[in-house]
Amino acid sequence: MTRNLTVLVLVALAFMLAACAGRPAQGVLISTAGIAGTSLVPIYAVTNRERSTTDPGEMFSGERAAETSYAAIAVSIPPDTARKVGEVQWPASLPGNPATDFMTVSADYIDKPRFAASIAAAAKQSGRSKVLVFVHGFNNRFDDAVYRLAQIVHDSRSPVIPVLFTWPSRGELRLRAYTYDRESANYSRDALESLLDMLTSYSSVGEVTVLAHSMGNWVTLEALRGRAIRNRLAGTKNDKLKDVMLVAPDVDVDVFRTQLQRMGVARPRMSLFVSQDDDALALSRTIWGDVPRLGDVNPQLEPYRTELADNRITVYDLTHLAKPGDDAHDRAFEDVTSVVAMIRQRMAQGQTMREHRAIDNPLTQLGDRVTTLGR
């Protein structure tokens, strides 16, 4: 590695470290009694991580498992008056304070039949049949992903059943951890494909949406590619997988073109969230031969503008939503009240992701700073 690249890596790792600096070193998934006035978010997790043998609060490690495991976690979130919406409030020390911190009320290992029963029970109890599958990115421990999904669902008030697909990221900020995570992403595409097949087969599930972040987009797009090829060969139609949201995708833009081509016209509707000031993706671009990453393209420039429109991909350019000190890589989640909530509203109204007009886009209230493409 050249000296300039080494410096860039160190700077970028320091930048990304700030996003995780508040989390405790040990796992936080130890059951603790909640208190009145907090919100409880159930998370149903599916993973191909190994079970943790060293930290009971971790549940699952960053090592790869040969089999898929399941878990059910209930996360307590403090009142909005006691927290900054769009962020996870990590406890400074365990067990934490439920009045100000995210906390775990219950965390259980479950089997596949109980997972299916839990989804059915959640659908019946809430009257909801829409499932949101979250696929996290690089540098995520199991509890990172659990708390982030709980925050997204809570802050967006999304009317969904939250399912976490968490793949074996080591949750470390080292270059070799990045390459390990990338190979883990490759390792996990079949497991995600199987989960999507399983969810869409449930009679209790009416619709599935996937929300992928960063390197999780690679897992997602590869799983979608595999499903599309297999479904096309089998003649499968009327898939319940309707929408896919690609947030800051750490994916080679040339590879994305080939993935789209293999998916064909019967693929799910797609929306893309990009930021041209994303330092994490700038680092990734340098590592992977200076080829643009899908998450940092300028959708107003050719050939992207025409390609995205031709493929009916709705694009949200979040670059100009920048605030001093914010993390561009997580911007869509931190601006959750304006971005994810808008998507939630569209889903609740039964509209497709590309049926909106800029004139009625709630984000135009921010000064017409979001680009939307598609037709």
Predicted regions and their residues:
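Lipolytic serine-hydrolase domain surface
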Residues: A21, A25-Y109, A117-S118, Q125-S126, ...
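Bacterial N-terminal signal peptides that target proteins for export
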Residues: M1-V9
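C-terminal motif of bacterial Sec signal peptides marking the signal peptidase cleavage site
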Residues: M16-A19
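Gly/Ala-rich beta-loop-alpha elbow adjacent to hydrolase catalytic centers
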Residues: L192, A212-G216, T220
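The conserved beta1-alpha1 loop
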Residues: V133-G137, H213, A248
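Short substrate-entry loop that stabilizes the transition state in hydrolases
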Residues: N140-A145
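Alpha/beta-hydrolase fold active-site loops
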Residues: K130
